[in-house]
């Protein structure tokens, strides 16, 4: 995932250095068995950078050849740092940080610096895609949940947790029963 943030009027992205290849790149990795590509993206960013993220806009897929002629396809998303209090983060399994043999440096860089630092042209293309979305105001995303034939539980029959306030109750009341 290409992790981004705004710092004043500037867009910054998070890059990693891999000593084995002596390159600077966007955090990425291999999908574990029975893991979705989205879950993989979130896990790999956490392992390689120590940063928990929430995925946003999908970016292009990149295909290239690795050693032995094998083909590799990488799915990318724009991603923002998740708030520490995020329910999405609380629900995630703990991750083991990447060793310093895999990732030995992580840096937030402004776009111009990142473009110069990135080793591969396909990473620079992804950065350009992210910048275009940012300039068009299309990086901020939100979740929209559609429920067909859903029915809210009546307040009178819902056994709500006692420690929550009414606003939280309404936000967490089951939609179906």
PLM regions and their residue ranges:
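Short intrinsically disordered, low-complexity coil segments enriched in acidic
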Residues: 1-4, 95-97, 171-175
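Short aromatic-enriched loop/helix-cap "lid" or pocket-rim segments at secondary-structure transitions
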Residues: 67-71, 155-160
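Conserved acetyl-CoA binding element of GNAT-fold acetyltransferases
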Residues: 25-29, 165
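Unchanged
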Residues: 29-125
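N-terminal strand-loop-strand
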Residues: 1-26, 143-157
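Short, flexible hinge/linker loops that cap or flank conserved catalytic cores
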Residues: 7, 100, 137-139
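Loop-to-helix element that buttresses phosphate recognition and phosphoryl-transfer chemistry
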Residues: 158-177
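Charged phosphate-binding loop/patch that engages nucleotide di/tri-phosphates or the phosphate backbone
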Residues: 121-141
């Amino acid at each position: 995932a290409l992790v981004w943030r705004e710092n004043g009027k500037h867009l910054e992205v998070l890059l990693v250095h891999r000593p084995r290849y002596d390159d600077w790149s966007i955090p990425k990795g291999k999908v574990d068995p029975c893991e979705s590509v989205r879950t993989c993206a979130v896990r790999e960013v956490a392992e390689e950078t120590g940063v928990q993220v929430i995925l946003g806009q999908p970016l292009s897929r990149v295909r290239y050849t690795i050693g032995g002629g094998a083909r590799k396809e990488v799915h990318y998303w724009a991603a923002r740092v998740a708030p520490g209090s995020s329910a999405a983060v609380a629900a995630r399994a703990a991750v083991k940080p990447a060793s310093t043999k895999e990732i030995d440096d992580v840096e937030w860089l402004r776009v111009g610096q990142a473009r110069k630092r990135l080793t591969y042209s396909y990473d620079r293309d992804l950065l350009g895609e992210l910048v275009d979305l940012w300039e068009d105001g299309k990086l901020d995303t939100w979740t929209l949940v559609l429920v067909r034939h859903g029915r809210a539980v009546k307040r009178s029959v819902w056994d709500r947790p006692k420690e929550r306030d009414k606003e939280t109750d309404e936000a967490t009341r089951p939609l179906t029963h």
